[in-house]
Regions:
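Non-catalytic scaffold segments within catalytic domains of secreted glycoside hydrolases
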Residues: 1-56, 60-65, 70, 76-433
Length: 433
């Protein structure tokens, strides 16, 4: 089984997770608080900021033809209204490097991290973010749009609602357990395994009493509204309006650029009695966004596992289920199921912008890729317009609050020397095109 040359087959990263020294971002501030929920700070990350050419060359030499990466808003606009020409030139060089090597750049304008100044202005619960994000988008596209064919405005726009639901449930259980002097019914690890991003719920709960004061000092508010904060329904709509405003700016400057958003989507399955949970959760994860994305050129589908519901709600994986380092069930068939479900309502193109596995055994990674890509091919054979697949991630990188403990990468990175080591899975993925 192979894909034709028009299919975009590649890997993905995000700026903060690989570049290093993203000192003007909200995450950098949070990582370096005394009572941080992060296992460790990002620091130099993978030094991709300086080594991008080496990394893109490794991607290309393995046979891959696409690279999804993000532009860091906090680098471009480190202070409100002040744009850094040197940083936009850096991203121009990254894009040109892709072009010279025959790799399609798929650019994301916001991948979780924001400038610290934005959070001080109210962050992602303030309507001001719509104007600010549109202005940033306009600047980037004016400078780089002539080199781009695909732009994702916002990564996993629905993540805030997913985190809100999980954090609320975990907080309630933790408080109940505290009152009863018993451990929570659901451990922090189990809660973390239900969301497609690296979170430390246990540590967040332990640090809560300290973090309010530290956040007040850092951001001017005890509860900073970063992009990856538990989001209100009103904040959810603000994110979608920011997407639409950014899309308008892109199309005004370069109408031919293909514009979309990416969503974190689980393969939702029901056992007896769980059907209503599945319907309600799919509505929250996907359906209610349709009015805001129905005219987009493509949707970025991001999937890692399935979620099973029974009569009393979400079920933990079976005892004999194989889990990843992230506590996800290893279930690569989920991707095909999600693509088919999305295609029922969304009529634009589909690009798998993230799909991967955090594990040390690379043979298991190769098998996961085999099964996931078979599902993609099945969808294409049924005339579903899947235009690309980007494995997460190109490099073993900074998995947010989990630090460097999660190994998603096709390429290993020595934490002391930054030396890259290609895993067999890199060329295994490249063999499909």
């Amino acid at each position: 089984m192979t894909f034709d040359g028009n299919f975009m087959l590649g890997a993905a990263t995000s700026a903060h997770q690989v570049e290093g020294n993203n000192v003007h971002s909200d995450y950098w501030v949070q990582e370096n608080l005394e009572h941080s929920s992060f296992l460790e700070p990002s620091n130099i990350a993978c030094d991709h900021y300086n080594r991008y050419e080496e990394d893109i060359r490794m991607l290309k030499s393995a046979g891959l033809n696409a690279y999804r990466f993000s532009i860091e808003w906090a680098r471009i606009e480190p202070e409100k209204g002040e744009f850094d020409e040197n940083e936009i030139n850096h991203y121009r060089q990254v894009i040109d490097c892709c072009k010279e090597m025959g790799v399609e750049p798929i650019v994301t304008l916001l991948h979780f991290t924001s400038p610290a100044w934005l959070i001080k202005e109210g962050g992602w619960e303030s309507e001001k973010v719509i104007e600010y994000f549109a202005r940033y988008t306009s600047y980037v596209i004016e400078k780089l749009g002539d080199r781009l064919a695909y732009v994702c405005t916002i990564n996993e726009a629905n993540m805030g609602l997913q985190l809100a639901a999980i954090a609320k449930r975990y907080e309630m259980m933790a408080k109940a357990a505290q009152n009863m002097k018993e451990p929570p019914v659901e451990s922090g690890k189990e809660a973390e395994g239900k969301v497609q991003v690296g979170m430390n719920f246990q540590k967040m709960m332990e640090n809560m009493k300290y973090q309010a004061a530290e956040n007040m000092q850092a951001f001017g508010t005890p509860q900073p509204q970063t992009f990856v904060s538990a989001r209100t329904p009103e904040g959810d709509i603000i994110v979608m309006k920011a997407h639409q405003a950014a899309k308008k700016e892109i199309k005004k400057l370069y109408p031919d650029i293909r514009v979309g958003i990416t969503l974190s989507l689980h393969d939702l399955q029901a056992v007896e009695g769980g059907e209503k949970y599945v319907r309600d959760t799919w509505d929250e994860e996907f359906v209610h966004y349709l009015p805001y994305i129905k005219d987009d050129d493509f949707l970025g589908v991001q999937n890692y596992t399935r979620t099973v519901y029974g009569a009393n709600g979400q079920l933990n994986p079976k005892e004999d289920a194989k889990l990843t380092q992230m506590e996800y069930e290893i279930y690569p068939q989920a991707l095909e199921h999600v693509i088919r479900q999305v295609n029922k309502d969304f009529k634009g193109d589909i690009i798998v912008t993230e799909n991967g596995i955090a594990i040390t055994d690379d043979e298991i990674r190769c098998k996961f890729i085999d099964d996931a890509l078979q599902g993609v091919k099945n969808c294409i054979d049924d005339n579903i317009p899947v235009k690309g697949y980007c494995y997460w991630s190109l490099l073993d990188n900074f998995e947010w609050q989990k630090g460097y403990s999660m190994t998603f990468g096709l390429i290993a990175v020595d934490r002391d020397t930054m030396k890259r080591e290609e895993k067999p899975s890199l060329r295994h993925l490249g063999s499909y095109i």
